[in-house]
């Protein structure tokens, strides 16, 4: 039985990024190997994660994992971990009993994204604008997706320490004359405008409808994919403005997070939305909003911003941690279960 202070995990290690619709897994056979991608699992196809792993993965592979490290979108407060946007409840004790695992660690999904930005490969990121990375300096990752995820990564005592939080729910307010025209038409949450009300998939639609309402025109599009596609092709003025404003507002919030963490190591934009609208993020609006932080605009110009283009960034972060857990200050108390 490992001691309570032991930070190592027994190989093979199953790593998993569990979202609202899809759960993606990979297998690390040993510390020197690259993760082997496993078939993705749709959460709606299985009643429990145990069923999904047994029938969707374990029955199809010859190597049996001894440990599991999972990233989930949901609060980790007890032996039962409900997922925010899916019907599963993760019960690590059941995983130990039913799947023959020896060790299960569950962390926040954006902790995994933060782990991935400690040492990203050049081909996994695209720089937006100027600035340069200061080694071993704090970093921030933001991810517009189902919601707006935010996490920091701080280097202290020769260790990268992920700092999860709820930064996506910070206040966001109007600054320009155009903002003040649009803001009354935005759908708030409990009387206030949080970043996540705009900077996520449904937030794109919230912003698009507000732009249309401010101009007295009827919305043409019904979902955010139509809005972003039309904007990038230059077909519809309201869609173009929506994505331009989205990039601007994302730049403002990203700049705020950079100031909070003094993120001289860089600010990273993760997730599918950032990848899809990358052409818009590469235009001046995002970076101008990011740098517009008087009295610290000169400082902001030195902080680099990147889009993460790795297709499985969270799994990449989990793999880095699984190989060398002592290189990272991941809190395990109350989040690790062993047989």
From Swiss-Prot:
Reaction(s) this enzyme catalyzes, per UniProt: D-glucose + ATP = D-glucose 6-phosphate + ADP + H(+)
Intracellular or extracellular location(s): Cytoplasm
EC category name: transferase
One Pfam family cited in the UniProt record for this chain: Glucokinase
Domain of life: Bacteria
SUPFAM superfamilies referenced in this protein's UniProt entry, alphabetically: Actin-like ATPase domain (SSF53067)
Main location: cytoplasm
Classification via Gene3D superfamilies: 3.30.420.40, 3.40.367.20
EC annotation from Swiss-Prot or TrEMBL: 2.7.1.2
Binding site for ATP: 16-21
Protein name, entry field: Glucokinase
Organism of derivation: Sinorhizobium fredii (strain NBRC 101917 / NGR234)
């Amino acid at each position: 039985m490992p001691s309570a202070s032991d930070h190592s995990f027994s190989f093979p290690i199953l790593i998993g990024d569990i979202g609202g619709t899809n759960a993606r897994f990979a297998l690390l056979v040993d510390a020197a190997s690259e993760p082997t991608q496993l078939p993705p699992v749709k959460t709606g196809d299985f009643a429990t994660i145990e069923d999904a792993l047994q029938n969707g993965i374990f029955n199809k592979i010859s190597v049996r994992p001894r440990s599991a490290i999972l990233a989930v979108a949901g609060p980790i407060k007890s032996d039962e971990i409900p997922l925010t946007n899916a019907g599963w409840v993760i019960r690590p004790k059941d995983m130990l009993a039913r799947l023959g695992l020896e060790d299960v660690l569950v962390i926040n999904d954006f902790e995994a994204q933060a782990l991935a930005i400690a040492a990203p490969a050049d081909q996994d990121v695209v720089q937006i604008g100027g600035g340069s990375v200061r080694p071993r300096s704090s970093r921030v990752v933001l991810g517009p997706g189902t919601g707006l995820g935010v996490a920091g990564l701080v280097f202290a005592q020769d260790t990268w320490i992920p700092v999860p939080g709820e930064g996506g729910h910070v206040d966001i307010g109007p600054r320009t004359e155009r903002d003040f025209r649009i803001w009354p038409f935005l759908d708030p949450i409990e009387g206030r405008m949080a970043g996540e009300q705009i900077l996520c998939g449904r937030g794109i639609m919230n912003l698009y409808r507000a732009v249309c309402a401010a101009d007295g025109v009827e919305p043409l599009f019904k979902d955010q994919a139509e809005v972003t596609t039309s904007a990038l092709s230059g077909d519809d003025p309201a869609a173009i403005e929506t994505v331009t404003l989205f990039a601007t507002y994302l730049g403002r919030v990203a700049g705020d997070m950079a100031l909070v963490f003094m993120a001289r190591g860089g600010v990273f934009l993760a997730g599918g939305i950032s990848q899809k609208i990358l052409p818009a993020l590469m235009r001046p609006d995002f970076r101008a909003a990011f740098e517009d932080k008087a009295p610290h605009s000169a400082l902001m110009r030195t902080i680099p911003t990147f889009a993460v283009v790795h297709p499985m960034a969270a799994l990449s972060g989990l793999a880095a941690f699984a190989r060398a857990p002592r290189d990272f200050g991941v809190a395990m108390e109350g989040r690790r279960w062993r047989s």
